[in-house]
A protein has these predicted regions:
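N-terminal active-site segment of His-dependent metallophosphoesterases
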Residues: 1-39
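Short secondary-structure boundary/capping segments
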Residues: 51-56, 94, 166-169, 197-201, ...
Length: 512
């Protein structure tokens, strides 16, 4: 039996484009003689956008789309796709099976397959919950699964750096243990700051693989298989770059901006963001803005210039010395601007310049904060938290270094200057300042954050590996800075737990 997967683009509210994708791929399936065509879960996710789905216009559009598909599909091919539907006073996600202008089956319950027979083959259809991929035990989907020849999964699965390998390992076991073929269809494209990676696949009952491309359209059939191939470390780095690039291109396109800009400090975070922006949009559409103060080192200023030269983007220098002195004079009769007040004032003056440039040039400001800084609030609200999109906000500081090293190795040259990589991290808001004056070394900080936030490890367990005072300091900073995280730029999701997605706590809590 010939089964095909249409790996279509996520279209959100664009119902016309959804139907256009359907028609193109349905006709392709007919031309190829496909018996079954599987789409991802189509249309907007009602669980995230309940306000829209409370309006009759959107529910009516979905019903019209499903009715259009039913009218189009004749007896030559069977179509399987996921969608939302208004049922019993609420919206639910279901999977529909359509052939010969009739709905043969609908499946709504998560992780409980429905069954039908088509051309003497038994099919199981699964509304799969992505969270199961991160659990160690594979659930039993029922004894009836062993009677099926095919398990069909129309998905809408966000990209995370570990997820493709988890999907393949998970469904390889399901295929082999139940002696059936897996058909897994997924979107590609961006949904706000999250991204669908595609990577749809077939896995046969022998554990062999046929996989679609990542981050682009593909149309594949179950006509040839090879050994399972898991992502290597370098391939994961490449996918992170592709994911961030795809989100940025879509974000710029749909938000109506023509270019992007960022504050360029000469540090590794802004260097990586500039590099990723050039990869995604071309250097001609990227502007770096250097805003040195009297605390900025000569090395940071020259490193920013060297980065601009190597990547080919425009660099503008806007010193903040005069602005800072004028602001300080106007404030000093009312309050003292020394210490942290003066440090934050510098960051906010830089934010002022960056946002003014955005208004003036119709340019999207890219935030340059990393996940480590965001987690512990090592940032200035309305200063370096400004921006429309945070490209590296889901990468811990140590991961930033790893990605930079990969990029330099890939191009066999230091397109991100070696001085930027080797220098001690510093906000340069006072003389001789280092991040380690305030935080543990990033090698320690990131392990603590990973264990607590990502792996759900208990505090007592973490105490076994690090000094209690260090762990307590890190967690206290995390718990008291939710108010900053709530006001930050949307973060491009590349890990299984991301601020603004899975990671959220009450602003007012008694954990400090």
């Amino acid at each position: 039996m010939k089964i095909s997967i249409a790996q279509t683009k996520y279209r959100g509210l664009d119902f016309d484009k959804c139907l256009e994708d359907f028609k193109i791929n349905y006709n392709e399936a007919l031309l190829r003689g496909s018996d079954v065509l599987v789409f991802p879960s189509m249309f907007l996710d009602h669980t995230k956008y309940s306000e829209l789905f409370g309006r009759s216009k959107y529910s009516q559009n979905i019903c019209k789309c499903i009715e259009f598909i039913r009218e189009q599909v004749d007896d030559r091919t069977l179509i399987i796709f996921g969608h939302s539907v208004y049922k019993d006073g609420k919206f639910v996600d279901i999977i529909s099976v359509i052939s010969d202008h009739k709905v043969i089956l609908t499946v709504s319950q998560c992780n409980s397959p429905g069954f039908f027979t088509y051309k003497e083959n038994v099919f199981a259809v699964l509304n799969f919950e992505d969270a199961l991929l991160f659990k160690e035990l594979i659930p039993k989907f029922g004894e009836n699964l062993k009677k099926a020849q095919y398990l069909i999964i129309p998905s809408k699965s966000y990209f995370t750096k570990e997820k493709n390998n988890l999907r393949l390992k998970f469904f390889e076991r399901v295929a082999v243990e139940n002696n059936l073929d897996i058909v897994y269809s997924n979107f590609y494209g961006a949904e706000d700051s999250a991204v669908y990676d595609g990577c749809s696949f077939f896995i046969n009952s022998f554990g062999k693989l046929k996989q679609a491309k990542g981050f682009e359209f593909d149309f594949i059939s179950n006509d040839s298989f090879q050994d399972l191939k898991f992502d290597t470390c370098n391939e994961l780095f490449e996918k992170i770059i592709l994911a961030i690039s795809l989100v940025l291109r879509e974000y710029v396109c749909f938000s109506g901006f023509s270019k992007v800009h960022l504050g360029l400090s000469g540090g590794i975070d802004s260097a990586l963001v500039a590099c990723l922006a050039c990869f995604a949009l071309g250097a001609e559409n990227v502007v770096g803005i250097s805003m040195p103060s009297k605390f900025s080192s000569e090395g940071s200023i020259s490193d920013a210039k060297e980065l601009s030269r190597k990547l080919g983007f425009k660099l503008i220098e806007m010193p903040i010395k005069d602005l800072f002195e004028a602001s300080s004079r106007s404030f000093e009769s009312h309050f003292d601007v020394k210490g942290v007040t003066g440090e934050n004032l510098q960051a906010r003056l830089r934010g002022l310049l960056l946002m003014a440039y955005s208004n003036s040039q119709n340019s999207l400001l890219l935030n340059t904060g990393n996940k480590s800084e965001i987690a512990v609030g090592y940032c200035t609200l309305y200063g370096d938290t400004c921006g429309g999109l945070a490209l590296i906000g889901d990468l811990f500081k140590t991961e930033v270094y790893d990605l930079v090293k990969y990029i330099n190795a890939k191009f066999d040259q230091c397109i991100i200057p070696i001085n930027i990589i080797l220098k001690e991290p510093s906000a340069e808001l006072r003389f001789d300042q280092k991040d380690s004056d305030y935080l543990p070394k990033y090698e320690v900080l990131d392990i603590i954050l990973n264990r607590y936030l990502i792996d759900n490890e208990s505090v007592d367990s973490i105490y076994l590996y690090f000094e209690k005072s260090i762990v307590d300091k890190v967690l206290n900073l995390y718990f008291k800075n939710e108010y900053k995280r709530r006001q930050g730029a949307p973060i491009v999701k590349v890990s299984k737990k991301t601020f603004g997605f899975e990671l959220s706590i009450p602003i007012l809590n008694n954990m400090v």
